[in-house]
């Protein structure tokens, strides 16, 4: 019986070594993980989702944008500020920058790089008072009063006709900075 037990133990040890070698570890290159961010000395930190957001304006009939100054229905969006200290700054304003239509310095021009882009229309952003923002990279929006913690600064975007619009893709980009006072 002892001999049978010893034989089984030796056999188990030998087969365990073979099984281990059969499932050898393989390592391959996987890729790169990029980390992006910024440490700021400011009253608040811009929320990651606000730093690179897309506002969906949807489809608007060109008949609704037939004359200079006509607007689509507004679509709300916000710039969220986190970890705010009202003791550091009591107010925040947003400074937008972007390419504008020559005759309308408060209307973003569309990215007309693709065939089939809309014409005679741009995008206007309104601040929380309904005032159109400038896109010169210098002029700040109306001040927003900060509270401690999280703050959402509300805006609205509209399509803005600069003449009789024609249908097509109507996309634009703007960058922003936050000014604390």
Swiss-Prot record:
Keywords: Disulfide bond, Fimbrium, Signal
Superkingdom of origin: Bacteria
GO cellular component: pilus
Disulfide bonds: 44-84
Phenotype of gene-disrupted mutants: Deletion leads to loss of fimbriation and a decrease of hemagglutination.
GO BP, sorted A to Z: cell adhesion involved in single-species biofilm formation
One Pfam family cited in the UniProt record for this chain: Fimbrial
Location in the cell: Fimbrium
Signal sequence, start to end: 1-24
Classification via InterPro entries: Adhesion_dom_fimbrial (IPR000259), Adhesion_dom_fimbrial_sf (IPR036937), Adhesion_dom_sf (IPR008966), Bact_Fimbrial_Adh_Pro (IPR050263)
Function noted in UniProt: Fimbriae (also called pili), polar filaments radiating from the surface of the bacterium to a length of 0.5-1.5 micrometers and numbering 100-300 per cell, enable bacteria to colonize the epithelium of specific host organs.
Additional note from the record: This protein belongs to the group of SfA (S-fimbrial adhesins), which are associated with uropathogenic strains and with strains causing newborn meningitis.
Membership in a protein family: Belongs to the fimbrial protein family.
Record-given protein name: S-fimbrial protein subunit SfaA
Species of origin: Escherichia coli O6:K15:H31 (strain 536 / UPEC)
């Amino acid at each position: 019986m002892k001999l049978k037990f010893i034989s089984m133990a030796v056999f188990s040890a030998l087969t365990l070594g073979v099984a281990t070698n059969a499932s050898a570890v393989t390592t391959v290159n996987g890729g790169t993980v990029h980390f992006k961010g910024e440490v700021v000395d400011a009253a608040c930190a811009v929320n990651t989702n606000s730093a690179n957001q897309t506002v969906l304006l949807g489809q608007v009939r060109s008949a609704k944008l037939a004359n200079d100054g006509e607007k689509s229905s507004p679509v709300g969006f916000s710039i969220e500020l986190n970890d705010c200290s009202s003791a550091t700054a009591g107010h925040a304003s947003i400074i937008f920058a972007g390419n504008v239509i020559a005759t309308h310095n408060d209307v973003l021009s569309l990215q007309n790089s693709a065939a089939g882009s809309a014409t005679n229309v741009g995008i206007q952003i309104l601040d929380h008072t309904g005032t159109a923002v400038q896109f010169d990279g210098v002029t700040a929006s109306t001040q927003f009063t900060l509270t401690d913690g999280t703050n959402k600064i509300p805006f609205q975007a509209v399509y803005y006709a600069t003449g009789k619009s024609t249908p097509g893709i109507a996309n634009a980009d703007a960058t922003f900075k936050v000014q604390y006072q």
